[in-house]
Amino acid sequence: MIEQIYNYFTIDMLYYWVNLGVLPFWLILIFFPTSSLCRYFVTSIFPFIILSGAYIFLLYKSYLSSYDFDSNFSLYLGIDNIKELFSNKNFLMMFWIHFISINLFTGGWIVKDSQKFMMSKFLLSIPLIILYLIGPLGLLIYWLIRIFYAKNISLYD
């Protein structure tokens, strides 16, 4: 059975399931940000345990295929090194899970932070959708909206 699971979850299949798996969390964040469902399942540790499991599985698969983990540190040497690393599907998938996790965490933080200022769900959905699609731009848009609700600029909240 373990071998069947291992053979089923190829890199392409893992990519499919990770992308499909985060969609319910994002839909809950966007449409039900104040619900207990959001509080218990999305803004908790739950989605990150699942994504960490996928990451650990990918590391295990990479280890079995004799992946050179030391080469990951070459990404700091230049843009050409990053291009070379991204040509490896294992590294690309590790990066993608990392990116998905950070975006989801940031979306959860935005929802929690917005509740302090009683922001409307509709207004909150705009930066969340942009965060899901573009990443940091959604956080910037939320921060700009937040300035109007908080009536001050604070870099420490």
Task: Mark where each language-model region is.
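Hydrophobic alpha-helical transmembrane segments of multi-pass membrane proteins
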Residues: L14, M94-S101, I129
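Alpha-helical transmembrane segments of polytopic integral membrane proteins
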Residues: P24, L104-V111
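Membrane-interface helix-boundary motifs at transmembrane edges
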Residues: F32-I45, Q115-M119
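Hydrophobic, aromatic-rich membrane-embedded alpha-helical segments
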Residues: L124-F148
